[in-house]
Amino acid sequence: ATLRLDLDGEPLELHRPALPRLIVLGAGEHAAALCRLGAAAGFAVTVCDDWALLVTRERFPDAAELVVAAPHEYLENLDSPDARTAVCVLTHDERLDVPALRTALRMPVGFVGAMGARATVARRAMLLRSAGVTDAELSRLHSPLGLDLGGATPEETALSVIAEIVASRNSASARPLRDGHGSVRRRDASSDSCAVRSA
């Protein structure tokens, strides 16, 4: 986005990088919590579900985009997915999540995750392989989704998911900072900041 400013009579352009994208497939309670925390963490959140009764502005006031569609069909038509795009599958229905994951794992996105218990994860991996997903593609999948924070509520679960996405994006260990050495700032924050130049 570009914004023109006038500082001391001299026009400037303020260039703000586009927000990283978080695509949440499924519109249950965990999705609502993930949308809230994702938006607060600086993501442009899209929520997609094939059930229109769930995909409402009242339930997802912080979403940048609400989509009523089959998740895999939405992904197939996604505009400009890139390494700053994270896809999280929270549909809890293998008829939806298997085709969505098969599509997502073949896209140039930076993160693909799926919620589920370990038994669900194992069965889903079997179904994905049966659907033609290779072991190399399957190795990209973060599932069960989230870091082990010991939480139980949708909000605590969402926090663990956002933490895993950020750690993955930065190739970070996700260990406590007190167990590390050196600077706590691992990267140049200017990569996500605004750049100002004279017009």
Predicted regions located by residue number:
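Segments forming oxygen-rich coordination pockets for charged ligands
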Residues: 1-67, 82-86, 126-127, 168, ...
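ADP-ribose/adenylate-binding Rossmann-like module
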Residues: 48-49, 86, 91-95, 101-128
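Short amphipathic alpha-helix with an adjacent loop that forms part of the alpha/beta core around
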Residues: 72-83
